[in-house]
Amino acid sequence: MIRRPQSSTGRARSGLQQGEEYKNWLADFAPIFKELLEPRGSIVMEVGNAWEPGAPVMSPLALESLLEFLKKGDFKLCEQFVCYNKATLPGPTQWVNVERIRVKNAYTHVWWMSPSSHPWASNKRVLTPYSKAMLELLKKRKYNPGERHSEHVIGQESFFKDNKGAIPSNVIEFTNTRSRDKYLDYCREHHLKVHPARMAMNVATFFVKFLTTPGKLVLDPFAGSNVTGAAAEQLKRRWVSIEPQEDYIASSKGRFPRPGRAQKLK
């Protein structure tokens, strides 16, 4: 299950009471989603950062909401990720652009949770290309073994095995700066509303590959423009996406190139 719930930082959501309402709203889904998961299934949740209204102070609402969801569902926190958007616009405007007393906020929290301590996962499915230095090392089979300043001890042959790629970190980089893609072109052509807070495709693709195998079912209960469904479709996973706003459902058809498939999204 991959989910990006409605933002905790929405302009209409300012003040403690509304923040508490958001936290409780999110946490109430935890036991419901737990019933839908297989015992070794996973939930991946992305939540943006929040600022206190009228002050250059960050709110702990995002972390509090994740903690409350974790607690109410009795989930295990398998790993925390950071999604870093290196091309994000500066903001909040007053504190970053006008008064210049803060730096731009360029990341979101992503928590991977599961009812199990050992959910289905394999980092072999999400390996990244080796660096030029690593490729040279594999070719020359020569490096300096021994103890490092970090107290790690590197063996004589520790880096000689070719694993076909490097293990990725828990920091995922992406940009959402493209002015043209199939989804945006489809929205323009059919005069449809573009979703304003689309999940990055490579984020959804990473977790679908990491946590599932072909044929498994992926659910996104807050689908928006259905990035998760499109990623699952490309990776030959079954998928179900839920979205209450019909205009976003209509625009999501642009993510699916086959006309026959798109007709099923109603």
Regions picked out by a protein language model, each given a short descriptive name:
Residues 1-251, 257-258:
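Core catalytic lobe of class I
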